[in-house]
From Swiss-Prot:
The gene is Pelp1. It comes from Mus musculus (Mouse). Residues 646-657, 803-829, 840-865, 973-987 have a biased composition (Pro residues). One of its GO terms (biological process) is cellular response to estrogen stimulus. The lineage of its organism: Eukaryota, Metazoa, Chordata, Craniata, Vertebrata. This is Proline-, glutamic acid- and leucine-rich protein 1. A motif (LXXLL motif 10) lies at residues 580-584. A motif (LXXLL motif 3) lies at residues 111-115.
Length: 1123
């Protein structure tokens, strides 16, 4: 066609030079090219009488192609400009010439449409009135409908451009528009749609000038409201909705706002009247309109064959559309919407159900019309929500009840159809879900959808029903329907056998006629509405609802990806798959506070969703992955994080002052040179706690004896959010060791502790910690330390604690377990020659897992705080909840310790009551005084003789300090300087131990307690007496700071919450390497030797730490073994 345009220009154009060889060289210039094209179009349409050669293509044959040529010309840009005025002038003359002839009017209108859109302002103002007169002449002529349609389209563009120019606006309004409307009103019936298009343009761009003909226009519009042509009816409704804005500010004595409200009330009154006529004697309690509106006088149908109910329904539909358009269209002045009256009409329509209709007479016809009336009411409700927005919130309860009511009314017969068939009433249900999405989109979480109540449960049930794919089912049926399987009374006959139902459900899907995309519209609408509701109201929705959605969505996504439900399900449609992924993302972004989101499963689903055939679905999955990645791995740390991240290793700075509502800031410890990087075990669990260090990839190395961070607990992890740690519990010179793997030294300052070279701690072997984690939070969650010296060590993590990190490298006993009220003890002075070692960076705090049930005799004392100076405390630890170490394989020893604790409880009771109030004051006063010191110890391995001498010396010094306390040493042993009263013994049930010969289960919980002001005295230590026969079975638990988990536990046989007295000296006990069990036994043999001197101390302090119920039989105290 382009070649024909160019050839026509060179053949017939007077200015043929541009078409020659010289003109083609200038095609690169934009204005020159447009001028060439304009002249080519002119040449095609000009007569060829003067040409010596007969034209190959007569002009009349270009008429069908002329609209396409105009569109092609517009692709090259605007034709306006000073350089094209001559060509445009030629086109104007050509257009006027063609409009004057009946045979060439269509070509003239095509050129006029190009001139109106492309001419500059000056040219448009000069020729606009003449063009309007030409169009009016075309409308008055009885031309073909196609010419009339093109003339109205050109008129719409001309009025739109003329309304922007004040001079033309006044001229056309005063002199031309009334005549133009009269011409449109007089068009033939077959041109009514074109006439309505022209009237709509007039009332839209020149509403004031149409006021004089408002009455005639209203009658014309009303007469077309019940038209059977949907396009004609829609145009009539759009025009009628603009009637209140016609005329001046006081149209017929009424303001525009008053006119709008009066028209609205008239529509409401007429709709109530039509509804009464449609369903007379079927409504249980008909509601009459009480508004000020006057019923419209609608003309009766001239067709006597049309049923009156069908005519009434068509009028009702037209008036309802007019009401909705008045609500949704823009109006030039603020108006008052009678919300209550509109809602009354909507409720009256939706209140009519099939149960109220009598099926005799015209009842079936009324039942046939009812769904369409409900659809009109739902459209009206949607327009009302759009018009009023969140101001409808006070009617939110009514709207929340209406939606499930409509779904219940149109849910019959939906479960009896085979897959591949469209379920009945899907259009109504789709509209209900669209209104649900709109209502939540407008009002947000205030909409109150799915937030409990009978209506919320009913709505959720319908949503899940429409989202779930259909399933094939076979059912047995009896041939005669008898309950006895065919054995009926009367004449004897052969027994009848049950047969399968021979319905369509029996046929396999491949042999069944059906629609592969059946019910996809209602499914996609339900998914959109549910996704929007979860996204906006997710945290307010019940936990059970979230779990139900998880149980449905996750398997459904997997089935869709594996192609298991794509036979005749709605998920063959890409819209439904997109809605399913959108719902899954909403469940991630707005989870319930009590139901963790399925993050791991969703990440896998989105990853697989990127391979979808549909580009829209795969693009959404890619965007969802980016969103999830931004949530799980933010590129920058958040401003207020619940737990500290792991920055680059750095020395331990002094701790910050604690806050009352959050844990102290995280202080990154130093580098970790001894242990290699910890391998990662896989993605995060979906619903369980965050994996600990053992299951996360580490960028650095873990040292053999790292110090805990400022807010670390005995697991080497920082305290969970909103837990304030007193300063005495933070690492300092008085309550922190550099090694963190040895016991605290309770000797006076000046006694250097023994040291152990880092390479000898593990016998030159680099340990690699490993953990086994469960992905779900269950009551039986355990962490198994695979690197410990014995394979039977299992650590149960109770509620409120994060998972266990790698344990310290030195095999020292665990911190003592408190059983009484918080006890304070003076801090241990720092060693002069102690050497600071870099500490390990702590991992972020994981969420606390639930408490697992103990499988042995468990005695849980009340949650207490542990004193910092107790043996095995390993320096200060962060606050945790019940510190209790339980060995389920030594029930006899537990009974002995309980008896001893009960004996000493009475001795210490009086003194505890006197110092109860002092402890509370000192607890807060000592917070700022005891965070300035830090102890660091190193042990040397292989020098057992040196250790014996140092143990004796340090134990002597501790004994002098403990027995030298003024007036506080009682017969049973020295109590701490300030002791609050012990709690009464709690009768905790004992569980019978399991018949497990080897594995020992340790329930380890820790809650550090307050300390006294720093001083030369140290807290008396409490340790149970350990029989010599139990020495070799003793399990050494590393001190709580950090380190690999292989040194945490060995064969746990220690009594609950008590430690051996021999380890009191801190660095006196050397952990043997895993390769030398003989040295380990020798080291353990020397542990109970110093207990002979400290037996009385142990007895004195038992009641202050553990309250256990007394037992009937009390075995004699065990004798101390000789070293």
């Amino acid at each position: 066609m382009a070649a024909a345009v160019l050839s026509g220009a060179s053949a017939g154009s007077p200015a043929g030079a541009p078409g020659g060889p010289g003109g083609l060289s200038a095609v690169g210039s934009g204005p020159r090219l447009r001028l060439l094209l304009l002249e080519s179009i002119s040449g095609l349409l000009q007569p060829r009488t003067a040409s010596p050669v007969a034209p190959v293509h007569p002009p009349i044959q270009w008429a069908p192609h002329l609209p396409g040529l105009m569109c092609l010309l517009r692709l090259h840009g605007t034709a306006g400009g000073a350089q094209n005025l001559s060509a445009l002038g030629a086109l104007v003359n050509l257009s006027n010439a063609h409009l004057g002839s009946i045979k060439t009017r269509f070509e003239g209108l095509c050129l006029l449409s190009l001139l109106i859109g492309e001419s500059p302002t000056e040219l448009f103002q000069q020729h606009c009135v003449s063009w309007l007169r030409s169009i009016q002449q075309v409308l008055q002529s009885q031309d073909s409908p196609s010419t009339m349609e093109l003339a109205v389209a050109v008129l719409r563009d001309l009025l739109r451009h003329a309304s922007q120019l004040p001079t033309l606006f006044r001229d056309i309004s005063t002199n031309h528009l009334p005549g133009l409307l009269t011409s449109l009103l007089g068009l033939r019936p077959e041109c009514e749609q074109s006439a309505l298009e022209g009237m709509k343009a007039c009332v839209t761009y020149f509403p004031r000038a149409c006021g004089s003909l408002k009455g005639k226009l209203a009658s014309f519009f009303l007469s077309r409201l019940d038209s059977l042509n949907p396009q004609l009816q829609q145009l009539a409704c759009e025009c009628y909705s603009r009637l209140p804005s016609l005329g001046a500010g006081f149209s017929q004595g009424l303001k525009h706002t008053e006119n709008w409200e009066q028209e609205l009330h008239s529509l409401l009154t007429s709709l109530h009247s039509l509804l009464g006529s449609l369903f007379e004697e079927t409504e249980p309690a008909p509601v009459q309109s009480e508004g000020p509106g006057i019923e419209m006088l609608l003309s009766h149908s001239e067709d006597g064959n049309t049923h009156v109910l069908l005519q009434l329904r068509q009028r009702f539909s037209g008036l309802a559309r007019c009401l909705g358009l008045m609500l949704s269209s823009e109006f030039g002045a603020p108006v008052s919407v009678p919300v209550q009256e509109i809602l009354d009409l909507i409720c009256r329509i939706l209140g009519i159900s099939s149960k109220n209709i009598n099926l005799l007479g015209d009842g079936p016809l009324r039942l046939l019309l009812l769904p369409s009336l409900h659809l009109e009411a739902l459209d009206l409700l949607s327009a009302l929500i759009l018009a009023c927005g969140s101001r409808l919130l006070r009617f939110g309860a009514l709207i929340s009840r209406l939606l499930p009511q409509v779904l219940n009314a149109w849910s019959t017969g939906r479960d009896t159809l085979a897959p591949g068939q469209e379920r009945p009433y899907s259009t109504i249900r789709t509209k209900v879900y669209a209104i649900l999405e709109l209502w939540v989109q407008v009002c947000g979480a205030s909409a109150g959808m799915l937030q409990g109540g009978a209506s919320g449960e009913a709505l959720l049930t319908h949503l899940l029903s429409d989202i779930s794919p259909p399933a094939d089912a076979l059912k047995l049926c009896s041939t005669r329907g008898s309950s006895d399987g065919g054995l009926q009374s009367g004449k004897p006959s052969a027994p009848k056998k049950l047969k399968l139902d021979m319905g369509e459900a029996l046929a396999p899907p491949s042999q069944r006629k059906g629609d592969r995309n059946a019910n996809s519209d209602v499914c996609a609408a339900a998914l959109r509405g549910l996704s929007r509701t979860i996204l906006m109201c997710g945290p307010l929705i019940k936990e059970e609802t979230h779990r139900r959605l998880h149980d449905l969505v996750l398997p459904l996504v997997m089935s869709v990806q594996q192609g298991e439900v794509l036979g005749s399900s709605p998920y063959n449609s890409s819209c439904c798959r997109l809605g399913l992924y959108r719902l899954l993302l909403a469940l991630l972004l707005a989870p319930s506070p009590r139901c963790p989101p399925p993050l791991a499963c969703a990440l896998k689903a989105f990853s697989l969703g990127q391979w979808e055939d549909s580009l829209e679905v795969s693009s959404f999955c890619s965007e969802a992955l980016v969103t999830c990645a931004a949530l799980t791995h933010p590129r920058v740390p958040p401003l207020q994080s619940s737990g500290p991240a792991c920055p680059t290793p750095a020395p331990v700075p002094p701790p910050e002052a604690p806050s009352s509502f959050r844990a102290p800031a995280f202080h990154p410890p130093g580098p970790m040179p001894s242990i290699g990087a910890v391998p990662s075990t896989g993605p995060l669990p979906s619903a369980g706690p965050i994996p600990t260090v053992g299951s996360m990839a580490s960028t650095g190395q873990v040292p053999s004896r790292p110090g805990p961070p400022a807010t670390a607990n005995h697991l080497g992890l920082s305290v969970p959010g909103l837990v304030s740690v007193p300063p005495r519990l933070l690492p300092g010179p008085e309550n922190h060791r550099a090694g963190s793997g040895e016991d605290p030294v309770l000797a006076p300052s000046g006694t250097p502790p023994p040291s152990i070279p880092p390479d000898e701690t593990f016998g030159g072997r680099v340990p690699r910690p490993a953990f086994v984690h469960y992905d779900k939070e269950e009551a039986s969650d355990v962490e198994i330390s695979l690197e410990s010296d014995s394979d039977d060590s299992v650590v149960i993590v109770p509620e409120g604690l994060p998972s266990l990190p790698p344990a310290p490298p030195s095999g020292t006993p665990p911190p003592a377990a408190p059983a009484g009220p918080p006890t304070a003890s003076p801090p241990v002075p720092a060693k002069e020659d102690s050497e600071e070692l870099p500490a390990t960076p702590g991992p972020p705090p994981p969420p606390p897992p639930p408490p697992p049930p103990a499988s042995g005799p468990v005695t849980l004392p009340p949650p207490q705080l542990v004193p910092e100076g107790t043996p095995g405390g390993g320096g200060p630890t962060a606050m945790e909840e019940d510190l209790t170490v339980i060995n389920i394989n030594s029930s006899d020893e537990e009974e002995e310790e309980e008896e001893e604790e009960e004996e000493e409880d009475e001795d210490e009771e009086e003194e505890d009551f006197e110092e109860e109030e002092e402890d509370e004051e000192e607890y807060f006063e000592e917070e700022e005084e005891e965070e300035e010191f830090e102890e660091e110890f190193e042990e040397e391995e292989g020098e057992l003789e040196e250790e014996e001498e140092e143990e004796e010396e340090e134990l002597d010094e501790v004994e002098d300090v403990e027995f030298g306390s003024a007036g506080e040493v009682e017969e049973g042993g020295p109590p701490p300087p300030t002791l609050p009263p012990a709690l009464p013994p709690s009768d905790s049930p004992k569980v019978q131990p399991e018949a497990e010969p080897e594995p020992g289960l340790l329930l380890e919980v820790e809650e550090p307690g307050p300390e006294e002001v720093p001083g030369p005295e140290t807290a008396p230590t409490l340790a149970p007496e350990v029989l010599p026969s139990q020495e070799e079975g003793e399990q050494e638990v590393g001190s709580p700071a950090a380190g690999p988990p292989q040194e945490l536990v060995e064969e746990s046989s220690a009594p609950p919450a008590l430690l051996e007295e021999g380890t009191e000296g801190g660095g006196d006990k050397v952990p043997p390497p895993p390769e030398t069990p003989a040295e380990e036994m020798e080291t353990e043999a020397e542990v109970p030797a110093p207990q002979e001197k400290e037996q009385d101390d142990t007895a004195a302090m038992l009641a202050d730490f553990i309250d256990c119920p007394p037992d009937d039989e009390k075995p004699p105290p065990a004798t101390e073994p000789d070293s």
